Amino acid sequence: MKITTVGVCIISGIFPLLILPQLPGTLTLAFLTLFACVLAFIPVKTVRYIALTLLFFVWGILSAKQILWAGETLTGATQDAIVEITATDGMTTHYGQITHLQGRRIFPASGLVMYGEYLPQAVCAGQQWSMKLKVRAVHGQLNDGGFDSQRYAIAQHQPLTGRFLQASVIEPNCSLRAQYLASLQTTLQPYPWNAVILGLGMGERLSVPKEIKNIMRDTGTAHLMAISGLHIAFAALLAAGLIRSGQIFLPGRWIHWQIPLIGGICCAAFYAWLTGMQPPALRTMVALATWGMLKLSGRQWSGWDVWICCLAAILLMDPVAILSQSLWLSAAAVAALIFWYQWFPCPEWQLPPVLRAVVSLIHLQLGITLLLMPVQIVIFHGISLTSFIANLLAIPLVTFITVPLILAAMVVHLSGPLILEQGLWFLADRSLALLFWGLKSLPEGWINIAERWQWLSFSPWFLLVVWRLNAWRTLPAMCVAGGLLMCWPLWQKPRPDEWQLYMLDVGQGLAMVIARNGKAILYDTGLAWPEGDSGQQLIIPWLHWHNLEPEGVILSHEHLDHRGGLDSILHIWPMLWIRSPLNWEHHQPCVRGEAWQWQGLRFSAHWPLQGSNDKGNNHSCVVKVDDGTNSILLTGDIEAPAEQKMLSRYWQQVQATLLQVPHHGSNTSSSLPLIQRVNGKVALASASRYNAWRLPSNKVKHRYQLQGYQWIDTPHQGQTTVNFSAQGWRISSLREQILPRWYHQWFGVPVDNG
């Protein structure tokens, strides 16, 4: 059996981890294993391939179950554990591995992220702490087109978050890497670009300023900050070159071509360890070691053979890496380059060496820009228009000047002399100053892309195949049909009789979108925090991804968990009208008696009263949206006293099909008279799973269910969509209907929301 065939079986067996709605049980896995063993004895190649694929499928499922074990068993109760610190920001965020539990070693260790508290003494990677822990299963917000933090955490082997109740250090010594990093940080303090130097050299990106990260994102150069294939392969190449040069001084019988190869891989492994062996670096080392073994075999391997074997080795070592977007981006980049150079090789023009190098770089960057477009849109929901020019400057500068200078300085830092080290750091710092001067000179190039452009982004692949096969002459009908299919989503128009309500998963806040005919109105804008807000992080990219243009905002009240994203949204769309009960400048009133039409829908305000002196939650603007058949009552954070006042006069006008649960399901709201008077079918609650108030309240939830409501909340369902049409209404949620995946489930204690 060929090794590439085994690689295909590995990839095929583990790929279902990406799409399974839930993991099979133990009995199912036992049956599959037995069935695969039976198939293996059938002397037919295809059957044996199926058997091998089934065995790798079982291996992938067992690996996923192993990671989820901690989240399913350690939550709820206090745990006595020994934690080895793997990374820290030196303040309140610490990454660790639980190595011992209740006095017993556990294997493999479970990843843990601790937030919000300082440890009793100075902390660094490599220390071991005895802790009394209160841990939680990882749980992330889930929105269509948003960052999937829960999937990311599982791919990083970090199924737990939590806090420590008590902590005492057992092993106070830092790891050698941490000591070396601390020494570098002290040395680099005088240099303006020290944070970027540490990011490039040691993989320490926590201290890189947000402004720098935004520049690199907007110019499509953020990939240079990851310790990945580019850096590690260059370290291996540099080490192999030095070893090969040293062989000149050896006797002929000691010179073997394998020695530079093995030495380069060993040096690359040391560098990967020095940078913290982060997942991208670890995957690169697995791929590099696989390539080295293929090379040592003495056989000729094609680019596709190497690609299959490397990807298979990575997935065999770590099956849940299939969830990692960085792995998919790296694998797609390599596959795109193999395809590009096979189907569109660089022209062999007679040029001077310098010009030929420039042409080769332009050819490479053109291929990677065009062919990676589909993956970039799927992962980042946008592209950088300046990435082509930016990478023409950044890749050669960073690869051939900055990184070698940093690597040399890191070596000289251990041995001296000091004057040479300072010179190397200075040159590396100045090269970065030149790089970011160039990047800052470029116009803002990042644009958010709507989902409907996804298929058209495959056009470079399609056109390249058509051109190379001369298909536009031999198969013109198929070429036209293929082009039309890629453009089909762009021609689709929203049905005029349909409109949608979206409840976004913004955590402990509220953001709802009413959409019709490509236009939208927002009811509240989520939260704000010191580093950002829901508008910038979620709502704006979400609107772009769904090709919706907002025309107005309704603010229920002034609390920050409801208006947090407003400023960011107004920065992008400054002409939006705003309705609120706040009497702020440029705000239209949202008080009892106000009514308006929008896209054929009738909006009517039912609370507060004109001239009301209420403040805070009880001053929330209650709005009813009605299409003549179905309706929604949006209530903000209104509480029981205001509910009673509203119902005492206007109870006949609040009946609705759907009710947005007031105040995130708090006991202070959702009085029984309100629930009964609305007489709705569905209750929609927005909250975070882990909130200090344990909302939504189980008592409130049961109250709605006893009155015949279907209960929907964002912790369990994620983003929720309600589609209204002439045929009625249909509700769907991201976790359960639209994107059901095993890694999106509610892990840990089933009823814990605090």
Model-derived regions: residue spans:
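Membrane-interface helix/helix-cap signal primarily in integral membrane proteins
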Residues: 54-223, 533, 537-541, 545-549, ...
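Hydrophobic alpha-helical segments
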Residues: 1-19, 294, 407-422, 426-433
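Aromatic-rich juxtamembrane segments at the membrane interface
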Residues: 155-287, 292-293, 422, 596, ...
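Non-globular, low-confidence helical/coil segments that flank catalytic cores
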Residues: 118-132, 152, 168, 266, ...
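Alpha-helical transmembrane segments of polytopic membrane proteins
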Residues: 24-35, 329-330, 391-399, 452-456
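Hydrophobic alpha-helical transmembrane segments in multi-pass membrane proteins
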Residues: 5, 47-50, 162, 212-388, ...
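Residue-level signal for inorganic ion chemistry
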Residues: 13, 83, 326, 372, ...
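N-terminal leader/targeting segments
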Residues: 1-77, 161-164, 176, 283-284, ...
